[in-house]
């Protein structure tokens, strides 16, 4: 999941991935720099930059494999109605040096998108209920990709990653999962293109209705088993902040006490002194600037 470069400029002599790297940095860095200033907060608070446990790291990596079938299923469903432009982007990446592709498709989106959408944007929703904050965060993340084909799975992942930030009080688990998810897509595409280069030179894979139906059924079957795994992995995250016990805790550890180590954790809930609202002027300005960057680059 990376936001596609919409530039109308032509740098024919420049590697496409280098141009993508420059475009993404030009788009993301100003927003990251002004985000904390807009909310008058410490950058550590705005971006939710807090240490996580080794268990959270392992759970974040495992979560990548668990959500894979669901993201693939949602991507297939939307590709029935909209062209899959991501395959074209991955075909372009196949022609570029591997390290450029990793930086452009995996590292920059994982770091910058999480800082902006699960940092600046999500922290702006602290006066909403957790459910509203996560859903709105997912909607904005989906819209920001400007790609209908990616809309369903980016929304689902956006909601999930927002909830993970709430549980762990950190953007790092989301960054790890985001990187692993994009990296797995990149590796899968490179292997596929290398095996069937003649059929995928233009980034388009010919898929019959029967083959599409077969893939949908396969991923639907896998998704049924993935959902409880996802719920369990997420429930293991953020336990040091008292974000609830892991699933099946009563069966596995009936006598274990879970202590809240940080009493200052700020829950996403309407505060009495503030009116609950989806947007304030700072967040609206951030989104306007973001859209302008997308259109101008």
Question: For the regions a protein language model found, what residue spans apply to each?
Answer:
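Short, membrane-exposed interhelical loops at transmembrane-helix boundaries
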Residues: 196-216, 250-278
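Hydrophobic alpha-helical transmembrane segments
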Residues: 95-112, 208-228
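Function-critical hydrophobic alpha-helical transmembrane segments in multi-pass membrane proteins
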Residues: 65-69, 88-151, 156
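Juxtamembrane helix-loop-helix connectors linking adjacent transmembrane helices
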Residues: 11, 15-19, 44-112
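Conserved small/polar residues in nucleotide/adenosyl-binding loops
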Residues: 1-5
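Functionally important transmembrane alpha-helices
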Residues: 150-215
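Membrane-helix interface linkers and caps
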Residues: 12, 16-61, 230-267
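Final/C-terminal transmembrane alpha-helix of multipass membrane proteins
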Residues: 276-297
């Amino acid at each position: 999941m990376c936001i596609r470069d919409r530039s109308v400029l032509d740098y024919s002599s420049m590697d496409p991935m280098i141009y993508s790297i420059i475009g993404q940095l030009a788009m993301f860095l100003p927003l990251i720099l002004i985000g904390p200033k807009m909310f008058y907060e410490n950058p550590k608070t705005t971006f939710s930059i807090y240490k996580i446990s080794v268990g959270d790291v392992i759970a974040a990596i495992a979560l990548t494999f668990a959500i894979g079938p669901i993201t693939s299923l949602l991507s297939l469903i939307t590709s029935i109605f909209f062209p899959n432009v991501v395959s074209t982007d991955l075909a372009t990446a196949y022609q570029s040096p591997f390290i450029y592709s990793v930086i452009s498709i995996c590292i920059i989106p994982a770091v910058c998108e999480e800082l902006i959408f699960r940092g600046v944007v999500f922290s702006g929703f602290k006066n909403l209920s957790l459910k509203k904050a996560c859903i709105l965060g997912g909607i904005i993340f989906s819209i920001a990709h400007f790609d209908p084909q990616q809309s369903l799975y980016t929304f689902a992942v956006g909601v999930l990653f927002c909830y993970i930030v709430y549980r762990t009080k950190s953007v790092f688990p989301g960054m790890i999962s985001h990187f692993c998810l994009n990296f797995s897509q990149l590796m899968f595409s490179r292997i596929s293109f290398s095996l069937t280069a003649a059929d995928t030179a233009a980034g388009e894979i010919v898929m019959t209705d029967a083959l599409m139906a077969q893939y949908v059924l396969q991923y639907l079957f896998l998704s049924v088993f993935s959902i409880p795994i996802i719920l369990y992995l997420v429930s293991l995250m953020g336990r040091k902040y008292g974000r609830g016990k892991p699933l099946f805790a009563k069966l596995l550890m009936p006598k274990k006490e879970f202590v809240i180590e940080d009493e200052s954790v700020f829950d996403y809930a309407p505060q009495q002194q503030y009116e609950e609202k989806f947007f304030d002027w700072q967040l609206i300005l951030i989104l306007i600037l973001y859209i302008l960057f997308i259109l101008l680059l």
